[in-house]
Amino acid sequence: MKLGELFEQAVEELSKAKVETPRLDAEILFMDTLSLAKSDFVLQKSRDLSDDEAAKLKELVDLRAKRMPVSRIIGKRGFWKYTFALNENTLDPRADSETLIEAVVKDYDKAAKVRILDLGTGSGCLLLSLLGDLVNAKGVGIDTSVGAVDMAKENAEANGLSDRATFVPVDWRDGEILGNLGKFDVVVANPPYIPLADIEGLKPEVKDYDPMLALAGGDDGLLSYRQIAMVLPLVLDAGGAFYAEIGKDKEERVKEIFTKSGYAFKKEYKDLGGIIRVLKFLSP
C-alpha cells in the first residue's frame, strides 16, 4: 500500500472517531513511526509501505481512534523548546502552561542565579523549561508520585539539564519534609484544579489517560491552592515570587486564598485564548 493512500484512510478513520485534528494527528503518528521530517513525509507519499510499516501504522491509528492522545501513543510531547517523555504518572503538558514559562522568564535576567521550586512537577516540563532559559538557575521538582519523579529525572538527563535539576518524591502537604528543602526565590505550580463534578465531562483524551491526581482539585477545584498557601512560607524566601497556573474563571478565588495568607497579588497573565491562566504573588 502507498504511504499516501494509508494516510488518507487514517484521516478518514480519525474523522469518524470525532478526533478534533485528524489530519494533524495522523501526520504526527506517521512521521514519528517512519522517522520522517515534514518535508520528507510529503515527498514520500507515493512510496510503498512494507507490510510491517503498514501494520504498525494501522495499530497506532486505531489507538488514536479510541481517543488515546497522540502524545501517549508516541510517549512524548513537545513543550516550550524541549521534548518531554511521558508515562502514566505524568500529566500531558498543555500549551496553556507555557504561559507560566513566559511569565517567569520575562521577570528574570537570563543569567540570574535564582533557585526554583516546582510543586507537583510531573514530567518536569515546567522546571526544566525554566532552567533551559535561565542558564544559571538551579531547581528542585517535587511530586507525590515516584513514577513521575523518575520520568522527570529521565527528561532532565535527556535534555542536558540534570546538573541543575533535582527531583524528589515529596507530598507538598508534608510540611516537615518540604521545609528541609530550604528557601527558594521562585516557586511555580500547576496544581490539579478541576472540580470533581466536572471530571466526567472532560474529553476522553484527558479523563481516561491523564492521572486523576493531576486533575482533581476537590469539590470546588481549589483544594490544592489552599494546601499550597499553608506550606508556601516554608519554601518561598522573603521577596520571592509564586507563579500559579489556574483554571478558567478561578482568578478571584485563588487571589483571595493567597492574599488572605499574606501574599501580595502582583500580576495576571493570559494564555493564547485570552483566558487568565497564571497569577503571580510576592512573599512579604
Residue ranges and their predicted role:
Residues 1-42, 46-49:
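Non-catalytic accessory regions of SAM-dependent methyltransferases
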Residues 32-106:
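Conserved AdoMet
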Residues 193-224:
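Mobile active-site "lid"/loop adjacent to the S-adenosyl-L-methionine
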Residues 161, 210, 236-237:
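Helix-to-beta-strand junctions that scaffold the AdoMet/dcAdoMet cofactor pocket
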Residues 7, 26-27, 57, 67-70, ...:
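A general structural signal for well-ordered alpha-helical segments in protein cores
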Residues 219-281:
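Conserved Class I SAM-dependent methyltransferase catalytic core
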Residues 95-201:
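Conserved SAM/SAH cofactor-binding pocket of Class I
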Residues 29, 67, 97, 126, ...:
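Residue-level signal for inorganic ion chemistry
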